[in-house]
Amino acid sequence: MSSIHVAVLLTVYNRKKQTLRCLSDLYKQTLPDNTNFEVFLTDDGCTDGTAEAIHKEFPNVHIIQGNGTLFWNRGMWTAWNAASKAREFEYYLWLNDDTFTYPTMIKELLN
């Protein structure tokens, strides 16, 4: 059976607490066998230490730096663009940084 690769995309701006909670929930996922995910996060010019906190707590997150002019839509496109250049993913999951997920969310979405 081949692996299923999921790219999780987020855009953040000065919402460190919410973003860390979202990522914490995300990394507690119970995934189906042969399934993995990578997180691609656009930091659109955060000034509250969001990127630094993410890098410290979740070093595997791909952080793409914005300059504060991307806003959510362009930030999500930027994250998707980085993910699509990194590898071929079967699925792309767009999340808001204040999304709190259940441990079986990805598994249920794939079913």
Identify what each model region corresponds to.
Residues 66-87:
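Glycine-rich, basic loop-to-helix element that forms the pyrophosphate-binding segment
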Residues 26, 54, 79, 105-111:
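A short, amphipathic alpha-helix embedded in the catalytic core of nucleotide-handling enzymes
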Residues 25-35:
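Short, acidic, metal-binding catalytic loop of nucleotide-sugar glycosyltransferases
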Residues 25, 43-52:
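A conserved acidic beta->alpha catalytic loop
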Residues 6-18, 22, 29, 42:
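A conserved hydrophobic helix/loop-capping motif in glycosyltransferases and polysaccharide synthases
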Residues 35-45, 64-66:
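Short beta-strand/loop segment that forms part of the nucleotide-sugar
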Residues 88-98:
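Short beta-strand-to-loop acidic/aromatic patch adjacent to the donor-nucleotide binding site
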Residues 49, 74, 98-111:
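Acidic donor-binding/catalytic loop of UDP-sugar-dependent glycosyltransferases
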